[in-house]
Amino acid sequence: MNQARIWTVVKPTVGLPLLLGSVTVIAILVHFAVLSHTTWFSKYWNGKAAAIESSVNVG
């Protein structure tokens, strides 16, 4: 671990909860942004089937 000396400045009892808390907050913000800016994601989470909007011709 190349950042081991960070724990001489910040106690692990303070630093680890801050690190994990910030990761949690970022994950929640990303999920909120995806849910509020797309129409398909909330339908996907509710179990609705995807609508096929166009067909693909191969060959």
UniProtKB/Swiss-Prot annotation:
Oligomeric and partner information: The core complex is formed by different alpha and beta chains, binding bacteriochlorophyll molecules, and arranged most probably in tetrameric structures disposed around the reaction center. The non-pigmented gamma chains may constitute additional components.
Keywords (A to Z) from UniProt: Antenna complex, Bacteriochlorophyll, Cell inner membrane, Cell membrane, Chlorophyll, Chromophore, Light-harvesting polypeptide, Magnesium, Membrane, Metal-binding, Transmembrane, Transmembrane helix
Family affiliation: Belongs to the antenna complex alpha subunit family.
Ranges of the Periplasmic topological domain: 36-59
The organism of origin for this protein: Rhodopseudomonas palustris (strain ATCC BAA-98 / CGA009)
Consequence recorded when altering residue 48 to P: In strain: 2.6.1 / French
Any one GO molecular function term: metal ion binding
Cited function: Antenna complexes are light-harvesting systems, which transfer the excitation energy to the reaction centers.
Topological domain ranges for the Cytoplasmic compartment: 1-11
Compartmental location: Cell inner membrane
Annotated membrane topology: Single-pass type II membrane protein
Spans traversing the lipid bilayer: 12-35
Annotated InterPro entries: Antenna_a/b (IPR000066), Antenna_alpha (IPR018332), Antenna_alpha_CS (IPR002361), Light-harvesting_complex (IPR035889)
Taxonomy of the source species: Bacteria, Pseudomonadati, Pseudomonadota, Alphaproteobacteria, Hyphomicrobiales
Any GO CC annotation of this UniProt entry: organelle inner membrane
Name of the protein: Light-harvesting protein B-800-850 alpha chain A
Source domain of life: Bacteria
GO terms classed as biological process: photosynthesis, light reaction
UniProt binding sites for a bacteriochlorophyll: 31
